[in-house]
Amino acid sequence: MESTALQQAFDTCQNNKAAWLQRKNELAAAEQEYLRLLSGEGRNVSRLDELRNIIEVRKWQVNQAAGRYIRSHEAVQHISIRDRLNDFMQQHGTALAAALAPELMGYSELTAIARNCAIQRATDALREALLSWLAKGEKINYSAQDSDILTTIGFRPDVASVDDSREKFTPAQNMIFSRKSAQLASRQSV
């Protein structure tokens, strides 16, 4: 059974993916109309200018929507990992601490700097053990609790979303595009 947080993150991820795909479709439609007008006789210059502005805003909207989708995809994976590690520690935390006792013994009495060093050495030991296990080539599967959700969203976000989110905008550019986007939305709702 999934946690409420995981289910909410999954729903957000799916909604963000749908919004990103919708923005891509809107951009494609504007670009098609622009090309159709550009290749036609008796070009409507004002409509071409308007479409150039719409395309510019749509590209920004696609970029922003792709970024939201990618971040929400990462959130689903992060919540799943956190939940499963919490479950693991509930069941096996004592055994893990015992295995790492040479590094962690007396942890609560250590100074902050010494605690950080102890945790770092314990983390290094865990990393080494995990790398050794991975080197055996064992098959890795999603946990049974989260398998449906993780399989649905996929191992990584869609490659196209990564490409769509590559361009970075300054805060000033984001403000300008946000304003243009609101103006475009108000014109289209009339």
UniProtKB/Swiss-Prot annotation:
Q: Per the UniProt entry, what are the Gene Ontology biological process annotations, in alphabetical order?
A: symbiont-mediated activation of host transcription
* Any Pfam family matching the protein: Psu
Q: Which UniProt keywords apply?
A: Late protein
Against InterPro entries, the record matches this protein to: Phage_P4_Psu
Function text: Late protein which functions to suppress polarity of amber mutations in the late genes of the P2 helper phage.
Protein name (Swiss-Prot/TrEMBL): Polarity suppression protein
Q: Which organism is it from?
A: Enterobacteria phage P4
This chain is encoded by the gene named psu
